Structures are given as structure tokens and as C-alpha cells.
Amino acid sequence: VLCAAAAFLTMSGCKKAPPGTLTGISISYSGMCYDDTYGFSIRNDPVDGCLFSCNYKDDEWVELENIPVEDTHWQEALALAEKLGLESLPDEKKNSPGLFITDETLVSVCLIYKAPDDEIIYRYLDADGNTRSTLRDFFEDLAGQLQTEGKRGDA
């Protein structure tokens, strides 16, 4: 149950904070990090060694897909994000070609960080038309982390 904890995280929005280790991104249609209607996230889970996406549906988080963390698999994660409609710009107001069907306006992007003291930090970004580049930056950043972490040889 990888996503169970997500439902209990702060629902009041994202606080701005200096970044630590980038561990995930959440796309919201309501301004909250984890939207309880159309929210979903793609996160880097160092414990289970995979990227996963989650959808909040019928009052519970549902895991959609696992992607093993290897040097090139961030590209598959980006492809998954595109499939799920993450790159739809806020002003397009059209049904997602992916799994999330809504005509609501995308209003927030949260980057999820893990600070050196293990605090989880949510950095809120306004979805102002730069959503696509924000997501690409996230995956490029994540790719760099995965390439670095993948060479440590940790079991």
C-alpha cells in the first residue's frame, strides 16, 4: 500500500521552503498537494526503488503503475506522465487523454522534497502556463538523482 500515507498528509496546500532532495511531484486541480478528487502524484520512493503514480479514487489512494528505478527509466516515467495527461496546460480546459478525465482547470503544481532532517517539504508552484516546463525540469532533476544513486550499488 505505497500510497496510503499520502491521504494523511497536509491538505491545506503547499508551503514554500528551500529544496532538499527532490522526491516527487503532485499535480492538483484544487490548489492542494494531494487533491481528493482529481489528485495524483508521481514520486521517487527510495525504499521500494521505483517510481509510482497514485490516484485518489473512492476515498482511497490507488497505485496505478510501478517503474523500476534504473538510469534510463525516468524517460518511461515521463512517458507515463504524458499518458496520464500531466502535460495538459491549465488553459486548455479539455479532457485528459489519460486516466484522469476532468475539465477542471489545473491550478497548482507541488514539488515534494525531503530535507536533510527528513522533513517532507512541499514547494508550491502556480500553474501559470509553465506547467509543461516545470514537469520536464522535475524529471530531468530526478533523472540526475537516479543516475547518481544507481551507481552506489546499494541493495
What is each PLM-predicted segment?
Residues 38-43, 63-69, 116-130:
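Short amphipathic beta-strand/extended segments with alternating polar/hydrophobic composition
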Residues 52-89:
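A short-motif feature that recognizes glycine-rich, charge-decorated loops
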Residues 14-54, 61, 68:
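N-terminal export/targeting and maturation segments
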